[in-house]
Amino acid sequence: MSKCRFDEVSLFPEAFNNFFNHGLIKKSFEERIASIHIHNPRDHAIDNYRKVDDEPYGGGAGMVLKPEPYFSVFDQIPKLNKKRILLMTPQGRKISQSDFCRWSTQDQLILICGSYEGFDERIRSFADEEISIGDFVLTGGEIPAITVINGVVRLLPGTLGSAESLEEESHNEFLLEHPQYTRPSEFKGMKAVSYTHLTLPTILRV
């Protein structure tokens, strides 16, 4: 059994294909560090046209995602005890590295991707958290969901080659890293600078 199960609820499952086929993310799924299960609400539509959206009550621009297909998907997803259900929405709370750390301790993350004008409000009822990756609007929740998977998977034990990579990385202490260099020590007149021993001003010394 994998260390973390991801369940993606998305109208566009093909958006995730290339993401899982390279780098550390591919390695984590191949080695069963994590597993991914994608669910398309269109497969749960209740009419012959596989319709998943409708006009908003009261009028207005755009189409609203219908509750029936999403509730049907949600009911059929196996639920683990230690889980979080995340709704991708522009109105959600902006996430940070601390959220990835918190979610990496879960056995299951269910990520619900929106599209069109948004969700029927009743779909929000089964979400533990409504989240956003920034103060902007995208065409759907797939990119935020991919961001969450990427941020969480790399924190799972066995994904990165060295534990030090996690301990020393940029945002663990919410500080930016110093500039990084590698060989050659000089390139086109530009020299690499060693930050192994930094001299701090007296006021910053502990």
Please provide the spans of the model-predicted regions.
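Short, solvent-exposed amphipathic alpha-helical segments in soluble enzyme
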Residues: 23-27, 101-105, 128
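Short glycine-enriched loops at secondary-structure junctions
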Residues: 41-44, 115-119
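Structured adenosyl-cofactor binding patch, chiefly the S-adenosyl-L-methionine
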Residues: 119, 123-164, 169
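Internal, active-site/partner-interface "lid" segment
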Residues: 155-191
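Conserved small/polar residues in nucleotide/adenosyl-binding loops
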Residues: 196-199, 204
